[in-house]
Amino acid sequence: MANPTQLYRRNSTWRKNVLRSLSTEIIVNGKITTTLTRAKELRKVVDKLITKGKKNTLASRRLAAASMRKIKTKDGTDALKYLFDTLAPKYKNRNGGYTRIIKLPPRQGDNTKMAIIELV
């Protein structure tokens, strides 16, 4: 049986771009509401980004920049800079598990399972 958490029936470019956008939004805003399938896939991406942020080397900055959108936070700083300067020190003593998924009732229009994914 197929893995139900994977984003199927889409090409790899679409999948990569959706996960890039969602991961940048969760880093900037702290939490987002999305479908349960996207939240489960997004958890993997965000955990890897924060782990790269904890390393804080030039190579890890470049790898993180390649998988994030170039947007600003509410206070005007770049999302990548916010990841490395604010979020990474916050999770310095934590070994993984940086996100939490909270299940919501299904969406009204198409009965899709919804969830909130947030940083712990």
From Swiss-Prot:
Keyword Amino-acid biosynthesis: no
Keywords: Ribonucleoprotein, Ribosomal protein
InterPro entries: Ribosomal_bL17 (IPR000456), Ribosomal_bL17_CS (IPR047859), Ribosomal_bL17_sf (IPR036373)
Keyword Ribosomal protein tagged: yes
Family, per entry: Belongs to the bacterial ribosomal protein bL17 family.
Record's protein name: Large ribosomal subunit protein bL17
UniProt xrefs under NCBIfam families: L17 (TIGR00059)
Single GO MF annotation: structural constituent of ribosome
Cellular component, GO annotation: cytosolic large ribosomal subunit
Cited PROSITE patterns: RIBOSOMAL_L17 (PS01167)
One Pfam family in the UniProt entry: Ribosomal_L17
Subunit structure: Part of the 50S ribosomal subunit. Contacts protein L32.
Source organism of this protein record: Mycoplasmopsis pulmonis (strain UAB CTIP) (Mycoplasma pulmonis)
Coiled coil: none
Gene3D superfamilies: Ribosomal protein L17
GO BP field: translation
